[in-house]
Amino acid sequence: MSSGDPRSGRQDGAPRAAAALCGLYHEAGQQLQRLKDQLAARDALIASLRTRLAALEGHTAPSLVDALLDQVERFREQLRRQEEGASETQLRQEVERLTERLEEKEREMQQLMSQPQHEQEKEVVLLRRSVAEKEKARAASDVLCRSLADETHQLRRTLAATAHMCQHLAKCLDERQCAQGDAGEKSPAELEQTSSDASGQSVIKKLQEENRLLKQKVTHVEDLNAKWQRYDASRDEYVKGLHAQLKRRQVPLEPELMKKEISRLNRQLEEKISDCAEANQELTAMRMSRDTALERVQMLEQQILAYKDDFKSERADRERAHSRIQELEEKIMSLMYQVSQRQDSREPGPCRIHTGNKTAKYLEMDALEHVTPGGWRPESRSQQMEPSAEGGHVCTAQRGQGDLQCPHCLRCFSDEQGEAFLRHLSECCQ
């Protein structure tokens, strides 16, 4: 059992290192988020300070505020570069290396099981490889610590420059307030200016307080750097312990312990693979649902446009139909009025009767041209008589001099039945 203790310590060290790296990565992300929030609050304070100082109509304060804004923009750009820097990439690479190392250990375990006669030599080679990998991980962590230290120094320099600008701004405001106090009597406008200076000083104090808080945050980052250094020291101790175990290694591992360790690593690998597969399935389902929703939205938009166009065209058709009906009704009323005038002005006699029949015929033809839909026109008198003879209607031959006749069914109406004739005409011609 003493031979299994070094191997268990070596195998438990990799998860501990990965957990430590993940914890430090999350702490760095939270620290960056807090710094972003503080920068947003300070931007708001600077904007309010700029609006208040605009009322002073000075030349020094606006330029200082512009310089302060430039400093804040540079600070924000540095934070953005820090977010997009190499720290996150290095941490991800470290996690990937740990995963690859687990896979390599599994393959080496399988090789050891297949060749039991060289277990001791292969175990020594495996330990040497693990030591080399630890050295590589140490080098990567050193690079990461150096990058974090550089970023910390940059933040401290930026904070110092910002504090210097704030102090200079406060000094200028104090000088202006002293100059205004020595001017003698103060007008109402000067009193307002003094109050605005006091408010500007209060804002500057708030800004200084924010700078103090940012310095505290920088101190916290330095503490994180110290944690990294302690982690490096503990890792060095772990590597030294591995070297000592390698030197003291003389008895090969028992086959049962090796089998248990291989099975445990296989279970871990299967769990990781299943988690990755589930994540890929969820991502695929989300993408498919998003594409389906987008297609549905586009289809609904096209349907809405089509319905809108149909509604507009139908409304235009209805308006044209109503206008056409009104025009036809007006023409029919005018024709009826002309017919009534002609009937009132005619006199009895064979000659007058003949003229009246002819006039009624022309009026009837004119009414048919305006009322009958589909472009139907009576061509001749003989064509009008044919359907009446076939259908048994003989009212055309028996019409009086002022009678009205339907052009569709050849039904006759007297002069007093003008309204009935119009109703029949509208129903028969539909």
UniProtKB/Swiss-Prot annotation:
GO annotation (BP), single: positive regulation of transcription by RNA polymerase II
Biased region (Polar residues) positions are 192-202
Q: Return one GO MF term.
A: K63-linked polyubiquitin modification-dependent protein binding
Q: Where is this region: Disordered?
A: 183-202, 373-394
Where are the Phosphoserine modifications? 8
State where the protein is found: Cytoplasm
What is the predominant subcellular site recorded for this chain?
A: cytoplasm
Parts of the chain that traverse the membrane: none
Query: Tissue specificity, please?
Result: Ubiquitously expressed in all tissues examined.
Tell me which stretches of the chain form a coiled coil. 30-139, 198-227, 256-344
Q: Where is this region: Ubiquitin-binding domain (UBD)?
A: 290-348
Gene3D superfamilies assigned: Nemo cc2-lz domain - 1d5 darpin complex (1.20.5.990)
InterPro entries, alphabetized? EABR, NEMO_ZF
Keywords, comma-separated and alphabetical: Apoptosis, Coiled coil, Cytoplasm, Inflammatory response, Metal-binding, Phosphoprotein, Transcription, Transcription regulation, Ubl conjugation, Zinc, Zinc-finger
On modification after translation, the UniProt record reads:
In vitro phosphorylated by CHUK.
The keyword Transcription regulation belongs to this UniProt entry's keyword annotation: yes
Q: Where along this sequence does the record place binding of Zn(2+)?
A: 406, 409, 424, 428
Q: Please indicate which superkingdom the organism of origin belongs to.
A: Eukaryota
Zinc finger region(s), CCHC NOA-type: 398-430
Q: Which GO terms describe its cellular component?
A: cytoplasm; cytosol; nucleoplasm
Asked whether the UniProt record includes Lyase among its keywords, one would answer no
UniProt cross-references to PANTHER family, sorted A to Z: TNFAIP3-INTERACTING PROTEIN 2 (PTHR31882:SF6), TNFAIP3-INTERACTING PROTEIN COILED COIL FAMILY MEMBER (PTHR31882)
What is the annotated role of this protein in its UniProt record? Inhibits NF-kappa-B activation by blocking the interaction of RIPK1 with its downstream effector NEMO/IKBKG. Forms a ternary complex with NFKB1 and MAP3K8 but appears to function upstream of MAP3K8 in the TLR4 signaling pathway that regulates MAP3K8 activation. Involved in activation of the MEK/ERK signaling pathway during innate immune response; this function seems to be stimulus- and cell type specific. Required for stability of MAP3K8. Involved in regulation of apoptosis in endothelial cells; promotes TEK agonist-stimulated endothelial survival.
| Subunit structure of this chain's protein | Interacts with STK11/LKB1, TNFAIP3, IKBKG, NFKB1, MAP3K8, TEK, RIPK1, CHUK, IKBKB and SMARCD1. Interacts with polyubiquitin.
Q: What is this protein called?
A: TNFAIP3-interacting protein 2
Q: What organism is recorded for this protein?
A: Mus musculus (Mouse)
The top of its lineage is: Eukaryota, Metazoa, Chordata, Craniata, Vertebrata
Q: Which gene encodes it?
A: Tnip2
